[in-house]
């Protein structure tokens, strides 16, 4: 056991985690050169296309160190985006140490900090690594100082490497062996295995990634899931070398995968403990704290026949992504669907794309909203995650919106732009610290503004140099109103949105204009209105298509023309009272982009 090292690789987006993992795998001979490819751990098509890591992946490697011993390295490559920070915290729970990878050109960024603090809170040994030293812009000395100054861990000894060219990879491995402690645990105690992650395989059922804390797990053992008390037979188990490789036993301290032919998706929840059926452990291992979704949106299948398939797909996906929340919802405009909770907009996009690709569904998404705390006049407090559920105005005493605490690291030259942006988003500055050329800004900004497009705007206003990390702080009373969109004086529930009163007029007008461009012209006028309660704040009209009824009477008598026009007008009036308007899919997505173009 003393030769096992469990660690995660944490870093900001694009600081080279996945490339470093590639090099480690190559150096330790996990894959032959023929099977090696760039970012070999990002196995999902989506990850390869976007060039980001979404799922944490684990690998077991054998490394023959300079002291002649062979060490077993179990490492987990983690995502860098703030939306997937839950994946990171789960991965860290299975480790004794973490490699903090910092780009020697970019320096410390917000996510570096956030992930590093998560690791320190879990009592992990953090080993700083300066990556990308082959870049012309690299300045390892300055960055090492930055790490000491901002993060507060000793970085003068930090290993310098370049994952792309392979310089210094040996040093990284030696550093891992030297600095990261071996796992603690008793191989003779009753089995305790923590489920770190699980996914659904159509042939094998539920596959779980586990970390053995105490005891030993063998093929053929009878095991029990501690939260449900159900027992299963271990059919297969093994490790990832990135390929799934079968073994007969998982020793104490190891990380590996287990298949027990569990057909039920809720059979082995993430964060649960596995133990032996007969000699079972008494205590459950501390799991993970549940994360609360920050953004809610309705997802509806385009054709209602897909509803069952959609429900199964969500079940299988939520097994793999423990931070996804969903409950059934109906909408008069869109039929049956689900209200889903996500950790952020990127998470929402990814989930929607995975559903459409992996499960072959066509989906419509409604506008994302955050969760609001509403105090009723009778003193009751309700939580509202969709504009349709907002109680009538005369029953509401006050609406409180969620406030996010945003930590940003900004280079000095972009400070002005970033502050302007934060003020525009109704932010309040709470802290500002200078670290050399970087400035650490802390703002309290309403969550609704942060999730919408704050991240994109922050990146574009600072040419990509500013970085952001945010978390929910508290609820705070605000003057929020619900803007309803009416088409031919019928409310379309899927288009409603909750906004701050100051922005309501502008958002309403912009949305109505956008809808006018997207709804196809019909044979009659379509009135599109935005309303707060019964008060109309904006309107625009999609003009009707009309036939030229006067074409056939050349000169002709004016009363004849009047008669024809009058007849057309009556026909249009009748059509308008009977006609209904089809709202195209693009119109629902228009809400997402209101306020983006300016």
Curated annotation (Swiss-Prot):
For GTP, which residues are the binding ones?
14-19, 131-134
Checking CDD domains in the record gives: EF4_II (cd03699), EF4_III (cd16260), LepA (cd01890), lepA_C (cd03709)
Membrane topology, as annotated, equals: Peripheral membrane protein
**Listed GO biological process terms:** positive regulation of translation
Keywords of the record: Cell inner membrane, Cell membrane, GTP-binding, Hydrolase, Membrane, Nucleotide-binding, Protein biosynthesis
| Leader sequence residues | none
Q: Where is the tr-type G domain?
A: 2-184
Q: Where in the cell is it found?
A: Cell inner membrane
Q: Which organism is it from?
A: Haemophilus influenzae (strain ATCC 51907 / DSM 11121 / KW20 / Rd)
Top-level lineage group: Bacteria
Taxonomic lineage from the root: Bacteria, Pseudomonadati, Pseudomonadota, Gammaproteobacteria, Pasteurellales
Molecular functions per Gene Ontology: GTP binding; GTPase activity; guanosine tetraphosphate binding; ribosome binding; translation elongation factor activity
Protein name stated in the entry = Elongation factor 4
Q: What is its EC number?
A: 3.6.5.n1
Cellular component aspect of the GO annotation? plasma membrane
Enzyme class comes to hydrolase
Reactions this protein catalyses: GTP + H2O = GDP + phosphate + H(+)
Q: What is its main location?
A: membrane
Q: Which family does it belong to?
A: Belongs to the TRAFAC class translation factor GTPase superfamily. Classic translation factor GTPase family. LepA subfamily.
Protein task = Required for accurate and efficient protein synthesis under certain stress conditions. May act as a fidelity factor of the translation reaction, by catalyzing a one-codon backward translocation of tRNAs on improperly translocated ribosomes. Back-translocation proceeds from a post-translocation (POST) complex to a pre-translocation (PRE) complex, thus giving elongation factor G a second chance to translocate the tRNAs correctly. Binds to ribosomes in a GTP-dependent manner.
Q: Which InterPro entries does the entry link to?
A: EF-4, EFG_III/V, EFG_V-like, EFTu-like_2, G_TR_CS, LepA_C_sf, LepA_CTD, LepA_IV
